[in-house]
Amino acid sequence: MHSRTPPRNRLAKVLPDEWRKLLVARGAPKRKYTAVCRVTLVGGRLIEELIVEEGWIIALDRAGLAGTFEQRIDFDPRTITDVVILQVV
């Protein structure tokens, strides 16, 4: 389940449960974490730096992450086929 507090990006999308479970299995805390992942989507699109915060996809790169911001997440999270965790904070 994603966090009850709203994400810093009001346009954020919820990360599917199977990928949240993978993050926890690979060492991310269940709550209060930020993870940087490399994600492959259906069709072969590669996102180098997907930022996940407490179960929410909040950004597609590290640019402009300070404070509250708006960045459009331009894909359906259900189309994720592979996740590689680069960093967990």
What is each residue range found by the language model?
Residues 1-89:
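Motif-centric detector for short Cys/His coordination patterns
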